[in-house]
UniProtKB/Swiss-Prot annotation:
One of its GO terms (molecular function) is rRNA (uridine-2'-O-)-methyltransferase activity. Its EC number is 2.1.1.166. One of its GO terms (cellular component) is cytoplasm. It comes from Nitrosomonas europaea (strain ATCC 19718 / CIP 103999 / KCTC 2705 / NBRC 14298). Specifically methylates the uridine in position 2552 of 23S rRNA at the 2'-O position of the ribose in the fully assembled 50S ribosomal subunit. InterPro entries: RNA_methyltr_RlmE (IPR050082), RNA_MeTrfase_FtsJ_dom (IPR002877), rRNA-MeTfrase_E (IPR015507), SAM-dependent_MTases_sf (IPR029063). This is Ribosomal RNA large subunit methyltransferase E. Belongs to the class I-like SAM-binding methyltransferase superfamily. RNA methyltransferase RlmE family. Keywords: Cytoplasm, Methyltransferase, rRNA processing, S-adenosyl-L-methionine, Transferase. HAMAP family: RNA_methyltr_E.
Amino acid sequence: MKSARTSRAWIKAHINDNFVRKANHEGYRSRAAYKLREIAEHDALFVPGMTVVDLGAVPGSWSQVALESVGPTGKVFALDMLDMQPLPGMTFIQGDFRENEVLAMLEAALGGKRADLVISDMSPNLTGIRVSDQAQGMYLAELALIFCREHLNPGKNFLVKVFQGSDFEAFRQMMQTDFSKVVIRKPKASRDRSKELYLLGLEKII
């Protein structure tokens, strides 16, 4: 039995390593690119020329996917607490999204215009304490949702990372008041042992 468990663990690790190798081969900054690509392809998230806001952007793989998808006529605004090497065609803002001053910087960069898609892969500094980590992650998700209420165009979409826990259902219902439909996504590149899920709000209600 122990051998079988070890074998299964090895197979899972091998599959996940494939995403790392694939990212290196294809020039993505992390394996997270394939999470967004899978969801985007399934739900047709991107349209050439659209404006995208990427929250929690470091190391930049989601912004890479967004830039490829929106093309030269599109715009990508990325924000994160950590610094990173900007990508060609991307506007990067470094700062804590929880701070009003940083939010004002993002609003200024948008120039009074609204986004056509908001994607958030924000994650708290994990402590290993499940209840605390889940609560902090949900708080970031709520802030991203609040941002969408003012800065996402009607009829457009919002993708956000959340962690399974006691607040998950309440947050999903909160999103349902702002979007015509809310669906759960667990892409293949998301590790099986991870508690992360992605909620996709489709067609923001005016």
